[in-house]
Amino acid sequence: MYVRRLRRERSNQAIADYLGSNGYTDALEAFRKEADMPNEIERKYGGLLEKKWTSVIRLQKKVMELEAKLSEAEKEAIEGAPTKAKRTPTDWIPRPPEKFALAGHRATVTRVVFHPVFSMMASASEDATIKIWDFETGEYERTLKGHTDSVQDLAFDSHGKLLASCSSDLSIKLWDFQQTFECVKTMHGHDHNVSSVSFVPAGDYLLSASRDKTIKMWEVATGYCVKTFTGHREWVRMVRVNVDGSLMASCSNDHSVRVWQTNSKECKAELREHENTVECIAWAPESAAAAINEAAGADNKKGAHQGPFLASGSRDKTIRVWDVNSGLCLFTLVGHDNWVRGIVFHPGGKYMLSASDDKTLRIWDLRNKRCMKTLYAHSHFCTSLDMHKSHPYVISGSVDTTVKVWECR
């Protein structure tokens, strides 16, 4: 009885403080009269109602997260998937709910990338800015300003000393990531929207792709364009360099993927099977070779494909995996309900991850050529994703203007 009365008195004091501090004087007088309260409110009750409400919201959020994790565990138990205790890092995949949902951009997030060394990530946006975040704490670090139109792509060099960005303002910028975080070089040369950038692994050259249908190679030290690759008949959407820097791949609105030798202007292969614009490409790591060969039905001892292997995602809603040497499409992954906007191979080599305009991230089992998990990631189109090479994290960006961090387990 006493405890109940004490709780009621404290609640009344907290409500009275809230009414008084927000200027609801008439309501406060009526409440005091109704509750038979003294005129003075003890100081310890200041802001108590709001604190209680915040605590309730925080607890509700925690309950929802725990329910999502419990649901995930139950689903795995029913489907017979490996439990957390039995999974090794090569099997870790992103699981709901997201660890962080980061807000700050004022328009569509176009690209998200991890820093190769530090616990940082960068996001580019149509609001013409680049934002830097700490992916382990979810803290906002800084904003890089300099572009005057939508920032389309980002790329760190292999040591993380430089960040390259490209924009609809026709420029490419290099940003110092050792000390100042300032723009140290701006390069001009494309005649239209610059849609993609990618460093050659050694870090001395940078490649860029544009709506002007060309790919350009730039010397990082001088900022001079040293080569221009021509061949695509429409907007070049993305360019990516393979692990040893000898080959680069590009994809285009002309429905094709082209593979080029970086030390010449020669087009090594033109890969044509997509039925719409090819939005994204990703080189397969060596760790994925066994899974890709098994999926392709090749005998690993006798008729195995040697690679290198390349994946491409398209507006035709499919992902295709190619043997670059033979030019063959080895298999196709079908499951997305809208454009495929981003793809990345799992470092362990067993899986591929994709982002799509159907608002999902999907995890694909390469050996079995099937979607093994779907994350309903964003409230609008998913535009980009990245997976860290050594830490258990995936990041995604969206038209909903948020960046999400997903923990792998």
Swiss-Prot record:
Residues 7-39 form the LisH domain. It is found in: Cytoplasm, Cytoskeleton; Cytoplasm, Cytoskeleton, Microtubule organizing center, Centrosome. InterPro entries: Dynein_regulator_LIS1 (IPR017252), G-protein_beta_WD-40_rep (IPR020472), LIS1_N (IPR037190), LisH (IPR006594), PAC1-like_LisH-like_dom (IPR056795), WD40/YVTN_repeat-like_dom_sf (IPR015943), WD40_repeat_CS (IPR019775), WD40_repeat_dom_sf (IPR036322). GO terms for biological process: cell division; establishment of mitotic spindle orientation; microtubule sliding. WD repeats lie at residues 104-145, 146-185, 189-228, 231-270, 273-332, 335-374, 377-409. Dimerization mediated by the LisH domain may be required to activate dynein. Belongs to the WD repeat LIS1/nudF family. This is Lissencephaly-1 homolog.
